[in-house]
């Protein structure tokens, strides 16, 4: 059973990897300018000026322990540098039954598109010398060869975007449909902001979730296993549904902005390159 699950994960990772090159090639026009140091990367003295300690966590390398600081208390501390924090981008894509949905076979699921964008962005960041973290991973992914291990780790990500290992002032990029109640998302983003993180939120939806193109009697089923909801004339609800979605999206954008995150949307029937390039430009401007 475990071997079968591993094979499925490997196959998905390989499929994602096979789709990466076109995205990376088109986005390297932006990455080329990044390589020249446009955003002020501090190459000299990278590890000299540390400015923060955090408690040791399982999975941290012993070589990163600051024994002098640790000797002053009954806790073990990890030393982190300003350069390390500034160069770290933490990536997270939501999992769950709702993300595994698509309205028609010609489209990717929201999960597939989220993972595709996460890995494509990671490829660009790794090429530019950034340190990439996945929420829940014990250590950073560094160097272009780290893309495959990152893809393999995606099914093991933290269930919610929370990770006490992330260095203060790192940037976070979150991929999800963000259809949960606003207060739930607010709590998650507020916790990241309190940790010193800022970043970007990308809402990924299926086109049918925006337009509600159905007509007649429709029976909606909860992907999480809840009771089905039969609706006799779905077209009569289209306007109210779209208005509610617009209010939810406006709320997402407002709370993200209030906590130091930018907000953008993407549909699975749109080219992934559009979202990737816009997101990469935002990262380089942050």
Language-model segments: what does each one mean?
Residues 1-45, 55-63, 69-71, 78-286:
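Exposed, interaction-prone extracellular/peripheral surfaces
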């Amino acid at each position: 059973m475990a071997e079968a699950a591993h094979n499925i994960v490997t196959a998905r990772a390989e499929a994602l990897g096979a789709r990466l090159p076109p995205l990376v090639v088109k986005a390297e026009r932006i990455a080329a300018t990044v390589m020249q140091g446009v955003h002020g990367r501090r190459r000299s003295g990278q590890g000299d000026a540390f400015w923060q300690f955090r408690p040791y966590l399982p999975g941290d390398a012993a070589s990163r322990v600051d024994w002098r600081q640790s000797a002053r208390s009954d806790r073990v501390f990890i030393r982190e540098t300003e350069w390390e924090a500034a160069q770290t981008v933490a990536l997270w894509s939501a999992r769950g039954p709702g993300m595994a949905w698509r309205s028609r076979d010609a489209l990717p699921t929201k999960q597939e598109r989220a993972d595709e964008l996460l890995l494509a962005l990671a490829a660009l960041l790794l090429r530019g010398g950034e340190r990439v973290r996945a929420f829940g991973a014990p250590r950073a992914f560094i160097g272009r060869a780290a893309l495959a291990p990152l893809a393999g780790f995606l099914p093991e990500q933290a269930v919610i975007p929370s990770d006490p290992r992330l260095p203060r002032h790192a940037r976070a990029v979150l991929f999800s449909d963000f259809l949960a109640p606003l207060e739930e998302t607010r709590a998650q983003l507020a916790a990241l902001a309190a940790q010193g993180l800022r970043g970007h939120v990308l809402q990924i939806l299926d086109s049918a979730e925006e337009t509600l193109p159905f007509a007649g009697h429709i029976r909606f089923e909860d992907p999480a296993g809840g009771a089905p909801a039969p609706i006799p004339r779905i077209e009569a609800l289209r306007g109210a549904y779209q208005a509610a979605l617009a209010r939810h999206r406006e709320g997402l954008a407002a709370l993200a902005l209030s906590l130091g995150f930018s907000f953008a949307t993407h549909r699975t029937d749109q080219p992934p390159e559009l979202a990737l390039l816009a997101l990469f430009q935002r990262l380089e401007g942050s």
